[in-house]
């Protein structure tokens, strides 16, 4: 490495986060921040990219980057192979955490909650608007399973292309969406001298309560 890790740092000076300017509903604040990220983050950065953390049946944590594909008053939706490693982990322990980081805005959002599968109709609706290659890939790839080499994956894709040569692929039963039902949402805004702003929303008795956390 050309630079010491201990010397890598930057000052956060772009903005602040005060209770006076933060709505009581965390979904409203998330939408505001997400819209800001869409306008500000430079391509090819994907503002809907997030880290999804899960825990397997043995208590081991796992995380990976996914794309947020839905947001409404119920929660945050993403799609994957139900038979993948993350799918098996969510079946064993249906709780997860998400983290969004928008460095250009010096902002981070952490979300924790329970997981539910979306309906088959919701999964199919999203599947049908995906590019054809992605739809075929959902059939072809045995996600998270060991394969011999890249050639095996390409062979599986070729077989899938032949299978659906004369018909549009339907949504596989092993593929679909999950929704994270948030119980906690924390908004982090970088500030100078590492004295960051942190507003923590917790869902209690059907309402959202908000507190400020020390950085």
From Swiss-Prot:
Species, as recorded: Pseudomonas paraeruginosa (strain DSM 24068 / PA7) (Pseudomonas aeruginosa (strain PA7))
NCBIfam families: pdxH, PRK05679.1
Cofactor: FMN
One Gene Ontology molecular-function label: FMN binding
EC category name: oxidoreductase
Pfam family, one: PNP_phzG_C
InterPro entries membership: Pyridox_Oxase (IPR000659), Pyridox_Oxase_CS (IPR019740), Pyridox_Oxase_N (IPR011576), Pyridoxamine_oxidase_dimer_C (IPR019576), Split_barrel_FMN-bd (IPR012349)
Alphabetic keyword roster: Flavoprotein, FMN, Oxidoreductase, Pyridoxine biosynthesis
Gene Ontology biological process: pyridoxine biosynthetic process
Function statement: Catalyzes the oxidation of either pyridoxine 5'-phosphate (PNP) or pyridoxamine 5'-phosphate (PMP) into pyridoxal 5'-phosphate (PLP).
Reactions the enzyme catalyzes: pyridoxamine 5'-phosphate + O2 + H2O = pyridoxal 5'-phosphate + H2O2 + NH4(+); pyridoxine 5'-phosphate + O2 = pyridoxal 5'-phosphate + H2O2
Protein name: Pyridoxine/pyridoxamine 5'-phosphate oxidase
Keyword Ribonucleoprotein: no
Gene name as annotated: pdxH
PROSITE patterns registered for this protein in UniProt: PYRIDOX_OXIDASE (PS01064)
Cofactor notes: Binds 1 FMN per subunit.
Entry superkingdom: Bacteria
Family indicated by similarity: Belongs to the pyridoxamine 5'-phosphate oxidase family.
Pathway it works in: Cofactor metabolism; pyridoxal 5'-phosphate salvage; pyridoxal 5'-phosphate from pyridoxamine 5'-phosphate: step 1/1; Cofactor metabolism; pyridoxal 5'-phosphate salvage; pyridoxal 5'-phosphate from pyridoxine 5'-phosphate: step 1/1
């Amino acid at each position: 490495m050309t630079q010491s890790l201990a010397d890598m740092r930057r000052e956060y000076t772009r903005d602040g986060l005060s209770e006076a300017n933060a709505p009581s509903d965390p979904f409203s604040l998330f939408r505001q921040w997400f819209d800001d990220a869409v306008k500000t983050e430079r391509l090819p950065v994907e503002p809907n990219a997030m880290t999804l953390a899960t825990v397997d049946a043995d208590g081991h944590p796992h995380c990976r980057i996914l794309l947020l594909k839905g947001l409404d008053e119920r929660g945050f939706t993403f799609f994957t192979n139900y038979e993948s490693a993350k799918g098996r982990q969510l079946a064993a322990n249906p709780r997860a955490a998400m983290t969004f980081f928008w460095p250009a805005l010096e902002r981070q959002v952490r979300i924790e909650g329970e997981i539910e599968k979306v309906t088959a109709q919701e999964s199919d609706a999203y599947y049908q608007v995906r590019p054809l290659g992605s739809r075929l890939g959902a059939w072809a790839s045995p996600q998270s399973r060991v394969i011999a080499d890249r050639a095996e994956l390409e062979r599986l894709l070729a077989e899938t292309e032949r299978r659906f040569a004369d018909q549009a692929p339907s949504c596989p039963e092993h593929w679909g969406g999950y929704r994270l039902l948030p119980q906690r949402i924390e908004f982090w805004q970088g500030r100078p001298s590492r004295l960051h702003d942190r507003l923590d929303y917790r869902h209690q008795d059907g309402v959202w309560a908000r507190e400020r956390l020390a950085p």
